[in-house]
From Swiss-Prot:
Cofactor dependence: Zn(2+)
Cofactor mode of binding and number, as noted: Binds 2 Zn(2+) ions.
Protein name: Ribonuclease BN
Keywords: Endonuclease, Exonuclease, Hydrolase, Metal-binding, Nuclease, tRNA processing, Zinc
Active site: 68
Source organism per UniProt: Klebsiella pneumoniae subsp. pneumoniae (strain ATCC 700721 / MGH 78578)
Root EC class: hydrolase
Chain residues that bind Zn(2+) 1: 64, 66, 141, 212
Lineage: Bacteria, Pseudomonadati, Pseudomonadota, Gammaproteobacteria, Enterobacterales
Length: 306
């Protein structure tokens, strides 16, 4: 899994930071799969500075309906049609997302020439398919807001082909079924259990991408044990009370969550426009006082989950 940050500012853009949006490239072995998390104003323009194209998106997840996470969506959807893209697209987000998209398209006389599905989510499982389990967690914000936990399925262990051949199983298409741990029947009537020929499985990676939130119990549940946590860090620690009153988190509150949840890496993002580069580095230092393995997200930063 690989993250590309298209926008890392909160509320309004700055000269160096666009509105919130993140590409998740799943790098599937058999086909391309690309997801987008939030779509603030200017997101489609940010795409132009990356190797990616909106027409290749399969899914878009919206955390909440505040404009800095959403107002780039209608334009991106329309441009996708104008550029002749036909790949189906599914949108996920809180109640009201369907009305927002349909109203924006209707009032502007716009449409999509590709299949567009809009699914309004609630707390709990969003889907479990094609190697990934996505769960939505309710957060603490003035409007309905979710974070998304993306858990990669465990990868099957290596198939012991040499032992299969030694046991009289001929190489060929059956090996693909056995690799998946399935049972197959041979021409001589023997039934072979693939799971007996597999080495230890490799645990899948887990990614927690938060929407806007003040500290809350659900945040801990969502982040627990994640390999990577992407979390807003809107204000510095001295302004924690102000941040919380508006449904946001401070630098050290975010770091404390990462520490308590036992995450591998914290990527801090969604910085107030009041902070220049020096101010953001100051917040990074505050985070690292509590959770040393913290990274500061910047527009177009790429992070690959090893």
């Amino acid at each position: 899994m690989e993250l590309t940050f298209l926008g890392t500012s909160a509320g309004v853009p700055t000269r160096t930071r666009n509105m919130t949006s993140i590409i998740l490239n799943l790098q599937q072995p058999t086909r391309a799969e690309m997801w987008l998390f939030d779509c603030g104003e200017g997101t489609q323009h940010q795409f132009l500075h990356t190797p990616y194209h909106p027409g290749k998106l399969n899914k878009i997840f919206i955390t909440h309906l505040h404009g800095d996470h959403l107002f780039g969506l209608p334009g991106l959807l329309c441009s996708r049609s104008m550029q002749g893209n036909s790949l189906p697209l599914t949108l996920y987000g809180p109640k009201g997302l369907k009305e927002f998209v349909e109203t924006a398209l209707r009032l502007s006389g716009s449409w999509t020439d590709y299949p567009l599905t809009i699914i309004e989510v609630g707390p709990g499982l969003v889907f479990d398919e094609e190697g990934y389990r996505v769960t939505a967690y309710p957060l603490s914000h003035p409007v309905e807001c979710y974070g998304y936990r993306i858990a990669q399925h465990d990868k099957p262990g290596t198939l012991d082909a040499a032992q299969l051949i030694a046991d009289g199983v001929p190489p060929g298409p059956l090996f693909h079924q056995l690799k998946r741990g399935q049972r197959v029947e041979l021409a001589d009537g023997r039934v072979i259990d693939g799971s007996r020929y597999l080495g230890p499985s490799t645990p899948g990676k887990t990614l927690a991408i938060f929407g806007d939130t003040a500290p809350c119990p659900q945040a801990l549940e969502m982040a627990r044990g994640a390999d990577v946590m992407v979390h807003e860090t809107t204000l510095e620690q001295a302004m924690a009370e102000k941040a919380n009153s508006r449904g946001h988190s401070s630098s050290q509150q975010t770091a404390a969550l990462a520490k308590e949840a036992g995450v591998g890496t914290l990527i801090a993002t969604h910085f107030s426009s009041r902070y220049d580069a020096e101010g953001c580095l100051r917040m990074l230092a505050e985070c690292r006082e509590i959770f040393p393995n913290t990274l500061l997200a910047e527009d177009f930063m790429v992070y690959k989950m090893a």
